[in-house]
Amino acid sequence: MDGFIVVDKSAGMTSHDVVSAVRRIAGQKKVGHTGTLDPFATGVLPVALGEATKAIPFLDESIKEYRAVMKLGVATDTQDYTGKVLHESDWSHVTTSALNEICRMFVGKLSQVPPMFSALKQNGVPLYKLARQGAEVPRQPREIEIYSLVIEAVNLPEVAFTVRCSRGTYVRTLANDIGGKLGCGAHLLQLHRSLSGPFSINNAITLDDWARRMQDGRAGETLVSPFAALSHLKDFILTGKGAAKVANGVVPALEDFQVLSECELLRDELVRMSFGGTLLAVAKAGLPGDWKMLKNLKLSRVFNLDNSFT
């Protein structure tokens, strides 16, 4: 099978656990995930099978969406409920109005210091390993962007919210920082990813359900094709002759395309090359120019998804 399965991850599983389960259920070795979710988190975890693994570097997962619940008054070393309590503070002064006001301060571009309990590495060692040894090392702030932050429900000391943010945002740290601004501390109780780029919870499936579909011969119905996963790229549709060229790693000529959109290509812009709705290659524009400058395209990756070119 070749495609992406959008796994609705259950709590307690690591991202590696999910990949191992998909590999076992599908009975194939070529499997990889596009990002990670904390073990306590649930929701969208895209997993690539077969030729879809080649598409991972070209995905646009710049926008993520999460639904979360934080608890005010308690700060932990992991910034979630699994960690050691660092301090407890009174939260009785917090009002819904104050919550909304503080949350508005976090919308926009921000510098966020990654947590010690993260997979980021320092001198080749994951930070979480250093943290488990009791070490605290300086971390460089990273620029992130919060596109929206909405308080969904307030049942103090618990607060439910939805956040849409850039890739690389730590929602645990966001909750911790909101708690700091409120003067009482906070940590995450729940984290559920509902969106990761083109992959939505609306198209997600649990591993148990997918295993049942595999037994029924319907597992392929749930897969997102590499072509669909790269829908953010301009699409150049090949003729059968052009498709055969691309399959052999040859850059097609102008006459090898069925449809060419009137469009400008930027330097290093990536485009799809397809035939019959199947992704055959991702190519890169070597020079800026209009769509007729196809001689400047270079094949970045060829996909072996279809060889029935007519």
Curated annotation (Swiss-Prot):
Keyword tRNA processing (UniProt): yes
One protein family per Pfam: TruB_N
List of catalytic residues: D38
Molecular function as annotated in GO: RNA binding; tRNA pseudouridine(55) synthase activity
EC code: 5.4.99.25
Enzyme class: isomerase
Protein's name according to its UniProt entry: tRNA pseudouridine synthase B
Organism listed in the record: Geotalea uraniireducens (strain Rf4)
This protein's encoding gene: truB
